[in-house]
Amino acid sequence: MNEEQKKALTAVLTQLDKQFGKGTVMRLGEQVAAHDIQAISTGSLTLDIALGIGGLPKGRIVEIYGPESSGKTTMMLHVIAEAQKNGGTAAFIDAEHALDPIYARKLGVNTDDLYVTQPDTGEQALEICDALVRSGAFDVIVVDSVAALTPKAEIEGEMGDSHVGLQARLMSQALRKLTGNIKRANTLVVFINQIRMKIGVMFGSPETTTGGNALKFYASVRMDIRRIGSIKEGDEVLGNETRVKVVKNKVAPPFKQAEFDILYGQGVSREGEIIQLAVNADIMQKSGAWYSYRDEKIGQGKEKVRLYLKEHPDVAQEIETKIREKFIGGELHLPDAAGDEIDTSINDEE
């Protein structure tokens, strides 16, 4: 590339950044993320690294989708807990009317300070969301879920009435209004979404998300969460092995993936992630079944080391800080995902 082309490239990238926001166009080989963007941790160290900026970006729209019982709500409760730990305020728009406060408390959410609403219609839910955003008082707002945002006309109509594209139009209109307010208020708004199957698809994935196409465009980050296995102790199932693919990312290079454990009643196994990443980054050494840190043996077998880190949170925090330094903006990187498993073609029938 000659000098004139370099100048032209710099000029057009600067113009696009001004017009559409920083990080609109990035070189895929460039591992530098938009570090001036504030982030809220997801509660999963591996996912924070995969996202490139240490968490989910404030002032942006984020979508997380996946099959039933894959960990979508669990992950968002972790995000709320992390925001509250840092003195932030959170709201949960429970369109599914299924929030479990006891489970939320187990994940570290301060339910006394959590603002919850259970709207009757999709219009009401999105109006409440817009009002909360415009107040500027909230750090994170979670909408659970897009599929449950039922238009008023559908609720008031008869069973079996056709309402083609009604929810898609509602989402499109709401997101046009929301996106500017979210940026100005520097609020993270997360939409949890479900997966549907398209009938008669011969080639490609038959899966698509609900609510039309608007959210796919307006979201700065889209995450596909899947359960890939079970964690067992004998015959007893203790939790799920989970994989999250970052299928869209406007604040850091996309297509990264994170794998971690979600334990029943506890949420993300933070200690398990620390062990895995610390060994990969050569912060912790593994010799046979023994693990050592700073030339001192800390346990035999992963479970013993996990218990050691739980009993010594200061050591766990020290190792986590070193991992973040090495991976986020450092010389180490997580592997890319194999590809987007969901069809992103226009589908406004939901």
From Swiss-Prot:
The keyword Metal-binding belongs to this UniProt entry's keyword annotation: no
Q: Which domain of life is it from?
A: Bacteria
Task: Using the UniProt record, give the first listed, main subcellular location.
Answer: cytoplasm
- Kindly give the NCBIfam families that the UniProt entry links to this protein: tigrfam_recA
Q: Which HAMAP family match?
A: RecA
| Record-stated family | Belongs to the RecA family.
Instruction: Return the protein name.
Output: Protein RecA
Source organism per UniProt: Dichelobacter nodosus (strain VCS1703A)
